[in-house]
């Protein structure tokens, strides 16, 4: 069995050292070991476990989606203002500005996943071939093949959402060829659908989100993937399968991201420091004051939510707040209406005075957490440039004095997303009434309880309501940037704008001055070519049947 070094694989792919065909070449393995593995179900399960470590790469705790940090940092939602770490602070800004870094080679380094993903596809196909040659019962073969095909479907989904086309390989290893053309986009999505349908039909039905994959996980991924190819009937079909499985929204929004008592999670990946599977999300994004209060050097706050995102949240009674008073470059002493905003705001964003770890957040100049001006102030480390910090997904109980590694789970799929996927498919089928009903299910979570939507009677109005709900409900779950791309609105929404924050100064007593500031040195820019990422040069060098996409030539 090979040892898995996924970080090394990503680095190698990012540096252009590998092509997919290098990974797909069949190399010698220990035949005795492989034979033993596929002669026993329990050891075969251990072999399949290899792929589970890739599930978190769907989301925000790793750098698979973007080697330079959260993809939200490429949008109006999040600002990387900390200059301590070049790749995770400077680079996302350059990508969002479409700076000189957006050559085909550098785009592949920071956004591409070609080489590492094809390596995993090759390994899945090898495993399926060995499984088919085993003497396992039909039931065990079907279950293990379903797990493997879930992963293959997941890998091809990640390729197609970036490149629109892929080279399709299956478990017939004789088809591997150094020179092989890209298959059509339609063929690629049909292949993803086939794998995920098989997985959904053959994995066990269970609401246990921990451990091995379930039918619900397969259908959840299917509902997400089919949005990208606009197969609305299959989105609805996948969602409806999940609706009958017994998942429920957690009453408290923040509980949807926790391990215990989570009725909403369809699949979560759990970390364990003993098994050395922790992550660094808290170290990167916790408020800077958390580190100093633990007796450490100021750190954290690599990126922070923007004022633009804050203004997306509704009042607890419904409708948007009027932020005109705080859109002043002269400054105002009036406190922002944080206490009037809906519960999801309080569960997602830390603001001036927010309760946190037995203290209150101080994102003001010379506060415990601090404020700094983007690209102007020295030693920004740990300080916010927007006046906010991220709360969602950050572990309030993490002890930095004990460990820099964190263990809160990554919830890969949850019911609220499925409701919104279903709503989108319904409105695309002109069923506005059902679409609005499922958006309202999310809005009326017991602990959120926003008013039902009113006067949303057209497809266009329902789509705007859906866009708002996805932006708020699914914030920082790694979906917003890709939503803008698949809707073909990124070029419009992410061009010619700048992100904003609040500069906060403590005055006398408990009074503060809030000043509206721009936190970008230039406009954001999403060039049309970014709707499809470039083929890596390493692939072009070795595969004579592939040409670079026209927009990247």
Role assignments for model-derived ranges:
Residues 340-442:
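C-terminal substrate/ligand-recognition segments
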Residues 17-19:
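C-terminal motif of bacterial Sec signal peptides marking the signal peptidase cleavage site
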Residues 40-49, 53-59, 84-163, 179-187, ...:
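Conserved, well-structured interaction surfaces
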């Amino acid at each position: 069995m090979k040892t898995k070094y996924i970080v090394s694989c990503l680095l190698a792919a990012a540096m252009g050292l590998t092509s997919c065909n290098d990974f797909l070449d069949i190399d010698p393995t220990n035949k005795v070991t492989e034979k033993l593995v596929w002669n026993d179900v329990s050891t075969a399960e251990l072999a399949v476990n290899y792929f589970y470590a890739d599930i978190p790469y769907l989301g925000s705790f790793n750098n698979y989606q973007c080697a330079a940090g959260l993809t939200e940092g490429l949008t109006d939602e999040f600002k990387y203002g900390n200059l301590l770490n070049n790749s995770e602070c400077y680079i996302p800004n350059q990508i969002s500005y479409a700076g000189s870094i957006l050559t085909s080679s550098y785009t592949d380094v920071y956004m591409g996943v070609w080489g590492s993903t094809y390596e995993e596809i090759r390994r899945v196909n090898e495993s399926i071939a060995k499984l088919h040659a085993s003497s396992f019962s039909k039931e065990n073969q079907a279950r293990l093949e379903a797990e493997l095909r879930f992963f293959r479907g997941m890998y091809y989904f990640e390729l197609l959402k970036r490149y629109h086309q892929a080279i399709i390989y299956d478990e017939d290893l004789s088809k591997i060829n150094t020179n092989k053309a890209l298959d059509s986009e339609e063929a690629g999505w049909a292949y993803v659908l086939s794998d995920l349908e098989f997985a959904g039909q053959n994995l066990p039905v269970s609401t246990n989100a921990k451990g091995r994959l379930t039918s619900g996980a397969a259908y959840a991924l299917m509902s997400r993937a089919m949005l990208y190819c606009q197969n609305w009937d299959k989105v609805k079909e996948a969602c409806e399968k999940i609706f009958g499985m017994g998942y429920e929204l957690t009453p408290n929004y923040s509980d949807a991201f926790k391990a215990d008592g989570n009725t909403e999670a369809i699949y979560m990946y759990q970390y364990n420091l003993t098994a050395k599977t922790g992550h660094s999300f808290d170290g990167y994004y916790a408020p800077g004051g958390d580190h100093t209060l633990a007796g450490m050097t100021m750190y954290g706050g690599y990126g922070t939510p923007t004022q633009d995102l804050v203004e997306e949240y509704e009042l607890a009674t419904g409708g948007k707040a009027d932020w005109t008073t705080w859109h002043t470059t002269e400054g105002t002493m009036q406190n922002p209406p944080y206490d009037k905003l809906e519960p999801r705001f309080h569960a997602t964003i830390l603001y001036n005075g927010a309760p946190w770890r037995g203290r209150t957040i101080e994102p003001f100049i010379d506060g415990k957490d601090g404020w700094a001006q983007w690209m102007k102030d020295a030693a920004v480390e740990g300080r916010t440039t927007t006046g906010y910090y991220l709360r969602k997904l950050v572990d309030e109980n993490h002890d930095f004095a004990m460990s820099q590694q964190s263990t809160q789970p990554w919830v890969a799929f949850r019911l609220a997303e499925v409701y919104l996927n279903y709503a989108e498919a319904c409105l695309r089928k002109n069923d506005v009434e059902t679409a609005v009903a499922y958006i309202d299910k999310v809005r009326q979570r017991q602990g959120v309880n926003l008013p039902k939507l009113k006067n949303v009677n057209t497809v266009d109005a329902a789509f705007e309501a859906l866009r708002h709900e996805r932006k708020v409900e699914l914030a920082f779950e790694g979906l917003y940037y890709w939503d803008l791309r698949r809707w073909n609105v990124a070029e419009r929404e992410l061009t010619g704008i700048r992100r904003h924050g609040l500069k906060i100064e403590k005055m006398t007593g408990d009074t503060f001055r809030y000043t509206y500031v721009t936190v970008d040195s230039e406009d954001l820019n999403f060039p049309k070519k970014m709707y499809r990422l470039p083929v890596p040069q390493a692939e072009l060098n070795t595969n004579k049947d592939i040409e670079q996409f026209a927009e990247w030539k």
